[in-house]
């Protein structure tokens, strides 16, 4: 039993390091592009739309998925890279301020224009569908054709709210 506990601890450590590296890369890339003064591919990246996020992406975090917990259950006020605002008791949705905070937090896990280059989409996706194997919440999305995965990908590609 102790061997499994040690293995689990190592997996958690590796995952934490990956998330820290992803977060640092997300923060460093824009700063490097700005300081170099050179045009970069990121300048051509689509802007992430807050209204699309609020109306189409946030509900996915609250949605119960078959055989899985809601994203929110593990990621509210957590120390994960995906750290969603905690809902007040009795509230089914976030306030405007909380949604703005969620938008800022979740945007750090996105490489605009590149769904598979975005931790937000790659991490909960099944490895055989292009995801990674480190999501402790399981395979939230079995394929890139999952309607919710496609909605997240649309947002990352710059889809605007209608």
Regions found by a protein language model. Give the residues of each.
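Aromatic- and Gly/Pro-enriched helix-to-coil junctions and flexible linker segments
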Residues: 21-162
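Positively charged n-region of N-terminal signal peptides that target proteins for export
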Residues: 1-4
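Bacterial N-terminal signal peptides
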Residues: 7-19
């Amino acid at each position: 039993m102790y061997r499994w506990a040690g293995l689990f601890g190592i997996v958690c450590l590796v995952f934490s390091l990956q998330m820290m590296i992803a977060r640092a890369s997300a923060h460093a890339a824009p700063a490097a592009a700005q300081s170099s003064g050179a045009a970069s591919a990121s300048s051509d990246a689509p802007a992430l739309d807050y209204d699309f996020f609020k109306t189409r992406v946030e509900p996915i975090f609250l949605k119960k998925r078959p055989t899985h917990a809601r994203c929110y259950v593990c990621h509210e006020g957590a120390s994960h890279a995906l750290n969603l605002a905690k809902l007040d008791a009795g509230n089914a949705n976030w306030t405007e301020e909380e949604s703005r905070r969620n938008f800022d937090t979740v945007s750090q896990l996105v490489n605009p224009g590149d769904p598979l280059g975005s931790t937000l989409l790659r991490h909960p996706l099944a490895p055989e569908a292009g995801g990674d194997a480190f999501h402790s919440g399981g395979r939230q999305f079995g394929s890139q054709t999952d309607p919710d995965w496609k909605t997240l990908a649309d947002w990352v590609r710059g889809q605007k709210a209608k």
